Amino acid sequence: MATLSQPQSALPKTKIATTFGLSKDLKSPISVKVCYLECTRNNVSLVPLSTKFEDPTVFKKLSQIYKNSDLFVEIRVYDGKNNNLISTPVRTSYKAFNNKGRTWNQQLKLNIDYNQISIDAYLKFSICEIIDTKPSVFGVSYLSLFSHDSSTLRSGSHKIPVFMEDDPQYSKNIQYGTLIGLTDLEKRLIDYENGKYPRLNWLDKMVLPKVDATFLKTNNKDHDYYLYIELPQFEFPIVYSDIIYQIPTIEPITETTSKIPPDDTLNSNIIINSIDIPMATSHDPSIMKVYDPDFHITANNHLNPNATTFDPVELKYRKLERNIDNNTILDKELKPTPQLRDELLRIMIKPSNAELTDNEKNLIWKFRYYFSKNNSGNDPSNKSVKSFLPKFLRSINWENDYELDHTFKEIIPFYWNVDKLQIGDALELLGDYFNPYTLGKPTYQDDSMTSKSSKMKSDEKRFIKIYNNVCFLRKLAVERLKLANSEELLLYLLQLVQALKYEALIYEKSPPFCERSDQIEDNASSTLKSPLADFLIERAVENEKLGNFFYWYVKVENEDQLNNPHIDGPIKIYMDILNRYIELLKAHCHENRLPYYKHLKHQIWFIKKLTSLVELLRASFKKNEATAKKVEYLREYLANSGNELLKFPEPFPLPLDPSVMICGCYPEESSVFKSSLAPLKITLKTIEKKKHGHATSQLFGKRSRYGKYPLMFKIGDDLRQDQLVIQIIDLMDQLLKNENLDLKLTPYKILATSPISGLIQFVPNETLDSILSKTYPTSVTYSGGGETSDVPPSVSNNGILNYLRLHSQEQQSEEPISKSILSTNTSQSNTEIPVLPRQPKPTITSDLGVSPILMDNYVKSCAGYCVITYILGVGDRHLDNLLLSPNGKFWHADFGYILGRDPKPFPPLMKLPIQVIDGMGGLHHENYNVFKSYCFITYTTLRKNSNLILNLFQLMLDANIPDIQFDPSRVIEKVQEKFCLQMTEEEAILHFQNLINDSVNAFLPVVIDRLHSLAQYWRA
């Protein structure tokens, strides 16, 4: 506030004091009250009734039909000199109008203060309506915030004209002086409302009604519409004030030493271009005030919906640091120090969904050449290069043309080819992050609702560039997938089918710049033209096994989308892909005389027959009816040759396992499980492949050898979650075998044939509950443990140990070595012998009476499932879903709860009952130490491949899987926590050692297992 006094000529000794405020001191946000919209036309021309029926499109624009149609007002603040938007738009909320007019009476507050605007700043009012779910401008109004006549801030009520789109003054008509277009009566009435005239109640009651009547007669009708608004009124006039800055001069270095106490630097603010910026105190002549032309750019960054807070200093630093022309030559020779290398390694192991900080992005950018030059895929010791490319792509600014050109014209073409791309990185590039419609969203749009012709050309060019670069990345990922063999591709097929959703969002969606979309390379209007869809269909047509699972995966997703139309995303993508696959498969088989298409039709027929059989059983019997009757009915039905299940019309591959040819079933070995859903156990008749050297004589024709394949068919449960877990277990098994570590896992086959049905392989087994409750013969119980045995009697009589002794005589032949199906690096020579990690010494269990082969299977499988179920957070573990096969392999079943979810209270992080340890010989036996060593090797091996596993879960976030949809935002975080990536390898091993000790000594899980067994007993 300031006070000026000046002498008058008539009274020389008298002074008049004028009190006013300065705009630079007014630290208050600009606020506007939107009152109402006045229509000066008595008869508004509306569309006649006949036109409504002739042209239904008129209904899209409600202002042509209703006099008081729904409208909303959007307010922006502009800098008058350059007409730059300097605030976030604000708009009125929805208001239902009546027949009296369009009245809002809503107070709006903008996110810019009065002391941040210049004297030429003005408000733009965009009156909009909704047409085809998008805002469309009805009219615009302008009001300058300062009056140039008096350099004062406008306040009080104002009546401003509304310019329609066909008005010649529509583009811009801003009055900086006295507002014209108002009658003398209107001016006086506004002055009265603004408080310039005293209010007398007795006089107002007499005069105001007559003024209103006169006002209606003499109202200005130069415009069809007028908008009435109110600005805040202040106690004093607000006069515009700014600071004139002097050109800085260069001072000697010796004179620029700081003479300011540290505390003083925090106590002063100076104003640069009417915006407060904390700086050092200005009384020191050695510190100069410099205008930053980029400051207004940072002020507008908050309009980015993906941004939270912005620091102008950080943004300026990033811009200067990434100046391509200045530091490219220097960056090529940069090498990180040991401390920086450790920091970069920590950044590289971050999951794909983790947000990188500005410092981390700058660090990745700084050493981009170092990582790109050392990205040789055949160097196993170079761990830091792993996952660098996706992290680098996440660290660049996609809105910066320099960074984009540098990345896609120099870094990727010269340093990154398909051979050097990790398979996990390729999967990450196919995720939802690399989408041009999110990466290419402009930082802000300058009044994009005004008209189509006023869109910025730079936004269009930038989006086209981002679109083409994203398409290039996705093609690069597909090219990497082409290097994988069909068996390896099958490990990721479930996630690749999910990735088709993200392809659809890119290739099906119309680009925002439709009129020039022809500039976009390879722009496809259909998902069928996406590189990933083309690749998967092509490989599925050529390889029958891959095509088998591709068909069922796509079929299930298609049915799920049709049954859940509320799910976001295009609903026809899987239907189109499925039809295209069948069409190409049929043509390919006809041209090459292959039976793949005929086999697929037989598989569909087989699933339909099983479905009708289950429905027939449910219709014929009640839920609580005896299971024996259902079994008898099932066997009679299967034995009836008229039902075509005893002997199929033609052999065909089993959908659950295409390597198995089935030709019929064994009715006497089929059954119905005791359950309300009545799942079937069908023992199929298989045709075994003939081995070389066992060919029969051709004199009597070909003779086939038959085998058995038991499976379960279930309707009523969604098996996709179990299918995902088994797929991850199978992948982990291959990763371990790739390191020469075969843990004898049992990833049994499971296939969802619809969202509510599926097939499950039936593996011979017994539950631990039944094994521990059995009584074994004395010959088995004391067959082991001679005089030299140190095993306690309680351990020697363990049910699991007795079970292994019982089956030791049956399993004397050692299984062949199982190799990984994962392809080695393409750059590695085939003659080079891979370096394998040192393995624990073989288990010797002669003192326990168990075959070394069975005990080896048991110890390894226990270690494998112990680690895997911990990483996946498998819950609801009890002795009924912990299984043991006659070959000694321990395994888990029923994955209804994963990612840490569990129906029981206080679930353990790892399910490792003490009875399982006793089956090895107890806590003090050598087998227990071997078990722990296998656990440690398994855990460290999977930690090294955590990026691949996390990327697979990342692609499943939009899948309709219960435990993923329960909290999709924390799925990756939950899995990542189990890997303990922030720890060193030694710390991780110690962490897992503590987990094993806690699980073995836990008391609560033992109690819960007893209660569960008791509950199962009473249910039986």
Curated annotation (Swiss-Prot):
Stretch list, region Activation loop: 892-913
Keyword Membrane: yes
Swiss-Prot/TrEMBL keywords: ATP-binding, Endosome, Golgi apparatus, Kinase, Membrane, Nucleotide-binding, Transferase
Lipid bilayer topology: Peripheral membrane protein
InterPro entries: ARM-type_fold, C2_domain_sf, Kinase-like_dom_sf, PI3/4_kinase_cat_dom, PI3/4_kinase_cat_sf, PI3/4_kinase_CS, PI3K-type_C2_dom, PI3K_accessory_dom
Gene3D superfamilies (UniProt xref): C2 domain, Phosphatidylinositol 3-/4-kinase, catalytic domain, Phosphatidylinositol 3-kinase Catalytic Subunit, Chain A, domain 4, Phosphatidylinositol 3-kinase, accessory domain (PIK)
Annotated ranges, domain C2 PI3K-type: 49-210
GO molecular function: 1-phosphatidylinositol-3-kinase activity; ATP binding; protein kinase activity
Membrane among keywords: yes
Primary location recorded for the protein, binned into one broad class: Golgi
Catalytic activity: a 1,2-diacyl-sn-glycero-3-phospho-(1D-myo-inositol) + ATP = a 1,2-diacyl-sn-glycero-3-phospho-(1D-myo-inositol-3-phosphate) + ADP + H(+)
GO cellular component, one term: membrane
UniProt subcellular location: Golgi apparatus, trans-Golgi network membrane; Endosome membrane
SMART domains: PI3K_C2, PI3Ka, PI3Kc
GO biological process: ascospore-type prospore membrane formation; autophagosome assembly; autophagy; cellular response to osmotic stress; cellular response to potassium ion starvation; cellular response to starvation; endocytosis; filamentous growth
Domain PI3K/PI4K catalytic: 666-1004
UniProt xrefs under CDD domains: C2_PI3K_class_III, PI3Ka_III, PI3Kc_III
PROSITE patterns named in the record: C2_PI3K, PI3_4_KINASE_1, PI3_4_KINASE_2, PI3_4_KINASE_3, PIK_HELICAL
Up-regulation conditions: Expression is increased up to 12-fold during exponential growth, followed by a decline upon entry into stationary phase.
Listed EC numbers: 2.7.1.137
Functional summary from the UniProt entry: Multifunctional phosphatidylinositol 3-kinase involved in acidification of vacuoles, pH-dependent cell growth, and autophagocytosis. Plays an important role in protein transport and virulence. Component of the autophagy-specific VPS34 PI3-kinase complex I essential to recruit the ATG8-phosphatidylinositol conjugate and the ATG12-ATG5 conjugate to the pre-autophagosomal structure. Also involved in endosome-to-Golgi retrograde transport as part of the VPS34 PI3-kinase complex II.
Family: Belongs to the PI3/PI4-kinase family.
Subunit record text: Component of the autophagy-specific VPS34 PI3-kinase complex I composed of at least VPS15, VPS30, VPS34, and of the VPS34 PI3-kinase complex II composed of VPS15, VPS30, VPS34 and VPS38. Interacts with VMNA7.
Protein name from the UniProt record: Phosphatidylinositol 3-kinase VPS34
Organism: Candida albicans (strain SC5314 / ATCC MYA-2876)
